Amino acid sequence: MKRYEVEGHVPSYLPEDKEWKLVWHDEFDGPDLDREKWDFRLNFWGKPFDAYTDQGIVFDGKSNIELHRSVRNGCYVSPQLQTGSNSFDIPKDVSSVKNPWGQDDIWPLGELSKPKFMHRFGYYECRCRFQKDPARMWSAFWTQAPGIGTTYDPAWSGIESDIMECFLVDEATTGNIMGGYGKQFRNEGRVSYPLKKTPDGYHVFGMDWSEKGYVFYCDGEVVSATSENVSMVPQFILLTTEVRGYRSSTPEKVEGEFVDDAFIVDYVRVFDAV
């Protein structure tokens, strides 16, 4: 991997077979979330999702953002950040009962908003420290296409690229999902692997996405690669946490003393090959 200097911050380490330029990044210098770059993900499949919140964001003053879990209605919740949105997440405005032709509004999607950042190809990198108890709150760094699963060929409707997911202590999962989230769901290059100890507890995850395929990295080493079903459309970035229980309708209630936990991120960077 080749060293790429970022003034005032730790460097990136990028694949050596290409020259790179930095095209988008957030170093999380604070003191507040940069709303020109990020939105909160608050909806899931067309309605507000009880697991998500716009609370729990903390800047530590050392160029880190912390995504903390918090409490709402007696249950744990946690934040998700995104630079765009899945078209199917957005709730439909039920007050708009007629379409432009005076008919009942049959369009299934809500009103789409302009994304903060969408990009195609390049190297996507995140440096982070994991939460203490990932079995109760997992974390992820990933990209997704707004129309995933809407065409037979994922090249033209995009995919989900999980650059990193953390469900278990000292383990990460990496790989792609395509075909949507129903009967045609499938995955490629998806692997789980143990994390090696680092001196400061931080890990660096990266994805080199090109017309030829995907190569995934953890701490400078290749952990997975695939050349099948390459997305040819721009995708948005997500930096997320999620507490357990909501997808099975049994969210974890706060019993006794509240237990804090946080996913800590140093930076997110996107590079283009030149």
Identify the role of each PLM range:
Residues 1-274:
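GH16 jelly-roll
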